[in-house]
Amino acid sequence: MRLPSIRRSQGRQGPSGSRVHAARRRRRRRTPAVALLAAALTVAGLAAAGPVALPASAAPAGAAAPAGATATAGDVTGFTRSGNTFTVTASGGAKARVVVARADIFRLWLSPDGSFTDDPAGTDLAPTTDFGPVATSWSDAGAYYRITTGSLSIRVNKRPLQFSVFRADDTTPVWQETRPTSWTGGRTTQYLARGADEQFYGTGLRLGEWALRGKTVPIAVDNKWRENDNASPAPFYMSTNGYGVMRNTWAPGSYGFDAPTTLTHDEKRFDAWYFTGDSLKSVLDAYTDVSGKPFMAPMWGFELGNADCFNASNPDYQGDHNRLRHQTTPDVVGYAADARAADMPSGWFLPNDGYGCGYTAPLKATVDALKAKGFQTGLWTSTGLGSIADEVGTAGSRGVKTDVAWIGSGYKYAFDGVRQAVDGIEKNSDARRFVWTVDGWAGTQRNAVVWTGDTYGTWDDMRWHVPAITGAGLSGLNYAAGDIDGIFGGSPQTYTRDLQWKAFTPAFMTMSGWGATGPSAGYHDKQPWRFAEPYLSINRKYLQLKMRLMPYLYTMSRVAHESGVPSTRAMVLEYPDDPVARGNLTSGQFMAGDSLLVAPVVSDSPVRDGIYLPAGTWTDYWTGRAYAGPGWLNGYQAPLDTLPLFVKGGAVVPMWPQMNHTGEKPVSTLTYDIHPRGTSSFSLYEDDGRTRAYRTGAYARQRVDVTAPAAGTGTVTVSVGAPTGDYTGKPASRGHEFTLHVATAPATVTLDGTPVPGLASKAAYDSAASGWYFDPADRSGVLWIKTPGTAGAFTVAATGTSVPAAAALPSSAPIDRSAWSLVHADSQETAAENGAAARAFDGNPATLWHTAWSSAKPAPLPHEIQIDLGARYAVDGLGYLPRQDGGVNGRIGGYEVYVSDTTADWGPPVASGTFADTAAAKTAALAPKSGRYLRLKALTEAGGRGPWTSAAEITLTGRPAS
């Protein structure tokens, strides 16, 4: 039986305990933007939006505007100070307040009627604003008033009232209004100058690319969950100019990052918190100082979760009542047993995730049985939270997933629903909050995991999930996730590829019971242990690796909890001065913490192109081969069992022994996996992983410092500090193991100056209490060192060893397509479905260029497309992605490629050949040639099926040419 296409519950209790309407929202076709905005305003209870804002000159400054007209504050008529609050009065009756909360943080509040009584967000979005005394001053500079702090100079222009912000030097601009903030009906808009190379990030969990320059982003709940939609919007963004802003509102809006940048919300007020800093990381720190730091999840929450309905016999259940092994809630225990029998790491279940599923009483028996197998239990809010005190306090459930009616139309309703779920856990146990939600907002990072909603198990969905989950971190959302292989459809191949990279994010989950096809005979189970080989073993490999990396990933989430900097990081966070890292050329990869670079494979191909390695040394995790960045790595061999994974030079990565769930065995030996290069360090964070005792100081830290040659031969020294701090369960002492990735065997290894014995084999090393062994065949060289248990500080030194030599990367790179334009296509389908030629380079593999086919007599082959690259490039490679919609017509077979400075004379082709008749991505190496124009000529159709040509994406590699 097909269920509604969005997993939602029937009528249930709202956050206040009242019953709400039955919520069985079905997946809808895309709706025009105007209709979406009207719908968003309706559910928010706001007035319909007025017309688009007119130029400021359309109405006299400060004049009372008729309904629907555009108004501004007018000219400044007064300026007063009370403490660190500066009030500006304008000629039209409006007032503005600048409230300096810290030298780098201030609030700008504009009230059109001068009352400052309308504050719908209250302290929900900005719970912490008192940072103590702030040294501020002001002066009258003639044309403007100047408010200064130790970090900023805020200018209040007098005629008309406009604002701008500069650094403390009063010359370096941070942001500047290009015209007065205006309001039209129920909509208020701010206009900012856009810098020549200014880039923008943020806006919450946006399903697509994270670099936003040139994009218009709705800040509105839409519950549609396709590319470029909003799973959890946030009225926050930050800029490479060194600032971020959070609009203090529940109203939907839209941010256009063009020139000028226009920032609109559907309310007749302007209220914003500004955060400044010398880096994106410092801006995130300031933003989360005010809106709340990301919560600290329990360790089991980092493990794989599994959601499904195991109570199919419930008459209210809207799914298949005959699902095998899913009749009553205790059936979930059998699945837990399957996981352990398959030696598969996993940490929690949601056994009631399905319309009308409910659970079989007594719940405690099931919770206890799962706990005995190392699983925690969470519950979907299909029955509301009316019983959460008993479910948490008596039965022992520890997680909540909110959905549909519980989050209603989003905004404050959803925010309060999540907060009530948090209270339900923390007021009835000593456990930490662990809540999953959609429709988050600014501030949700302190309470919940946000996930991408109901998505599909396709290569295309996987492609945009990478920047979506990565980009969420640019709004302080440390825990952003998506169902592994989606909720609908999927295949063993897409499942395994999706699981690989999501294992390097803090939180991830499977959702079973909804797939059109599935790996287990029609029951659509998406647990990793339900697959056949080779998928079973590959899934296990990456889940086991995540468990081993738990101390590293957990520490990175502690960093997020302290600083707002997420553990899943866009490349720009680690490399803000690298122009390549600032934009979407790197949106298909990310940093897991500060040391691991993950480049997911998101197509049905064993080859990964376009991996960008920034400045520094990068080591292939699997082979040990080292590369010298910056540069692009193409042709990386990535069969199904290989995720492209690179380790930064100098990395110090703590690792647990292998286990299938937290607490399965004691961490009697802690491994530090080290890629020595120069000077580096790591500060390990540990606590009990379960309770809230860490909030009162129950945790420990251990610092590790490494010195090594930057290149060549020398001594590698590892200094391990004594753990500081305490928590329940902290080991009194423990052994340590070090895996040093070096190229040659050492002359000596010492522990605090005393020689450590070298051992002749890995087997001898494994059985010894201490010693060292060098294996040149292990990932191009690994030095294994084992030390006895201790609670104190110690130093290990390996003399006479060498760090691996790093291979240079090619100088060519993917050519930015943002300036490309269509010059000519001999044929394109415009009368029927997707087919416009410009779609061959729109960055969306789901669209395509297709030559005309709806006419009675389609044009014959050959076909061609000509593209203006926007500038001259030395082109050395072409990428061709055939259509990805399941169709086969038009795949290019025989081809020729031309590059020229003019479309009047192409000269001879720089490449020719024949592409295979498959949907996989294709590449063609070109004889390097400089030019501004590309011509791709399709000579034949790969399958000989007809006179057509099609292309999902055309890409090029090369470098700028003079």
Each model region followed by its residue ranges:
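Predominantly extracellular/luminal regions of secreted and cell-surface proteins
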Residues: 551, 661-684, 806-846
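Short, well-ordered beta-strand segments enriched in hydrophobic/aromatic residues
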Residues: 88, 98, 108, 145-154, ...
